[in-house]
Amino acid sequence: MMWMICLFGGLGAMARYVLDVSIQRGWNRENRRTNRNFPLSTLVINGVASLCAGIAMMSYYSQSVDMDTVMMFVVGFLGGFSTFSTALNEVVSLIRQRRFTLALGYGIATVAVPLICVAAGFGIALLANPA
């Protein structure tokens, strides 16, 4: 079981890299003229990971999925996919650039968006499988 969690963690990290590069390319192309340096990709990735974690945990709670599957997906894949340490580093980077308002807003969003997404995941799972 442990090796499966590790394997899924590696797959999650690769998926994060692909999504991160894709979002950054599109975001940088759109904002090249305005010079906006908002770390959108990390926020999106953590939101998606939290949404999926909410769905997975509520699916386990409603006994639609077994614990081994949840462990491989949530701890493995989503553990490799999400990147809250990068989000905190981006807040520190914005502070060092003296972009205090953006750092504060991004710091709040880094906590609020995943919480909202995990709650939405709970709701989606409940709608899909009412108890």
From Swiss-Prot:
Subcellular location as annotated: Cell membrane
Pfam families, per the entry: CRCB (PF02537)
Main location: membrane
An example Gene Ontology molecular-function term: metal ion binding
Transmembrane segments: 38-58, 69-89, 108-128
Mode of membrane association: Multi-pass membrane protein
Regulation of this protein's activity per its record: Na(+) is not transported, but it plays an essential structural role and its presence is essential for fluoride channel function.
Reactions the enzyme catalyzes: fluoride(in) = fluoride(out)
Cellular-component GO terms for this entry: plasma membrane
InterPro entries: FluC
Keyword terms, alphabetized: Cell membrane, Ion channel, Ion transport, Membrane, Metal-binding, Sodium, Transmembrane, Transmembrane helix, Transport
Residues that bind Na(+): G79, S82
GO biological process per UniProt: cellular detoxification of fluoride
Role played: Fluoride-specific ion channel. Important for reducing fluoride concentration in the cell, thus reducing its toxicity.
Family listed: Belongs to the fluoride channel Fluc/FEX (TC 1.A.43) family.
Protein's name according to its UniProt entry: Fluoride-specific ion channel FluC 1
Gene source species: Bifidobacterium longum (strain NCC 2705)
Gene, per the UniProt record: fluC1
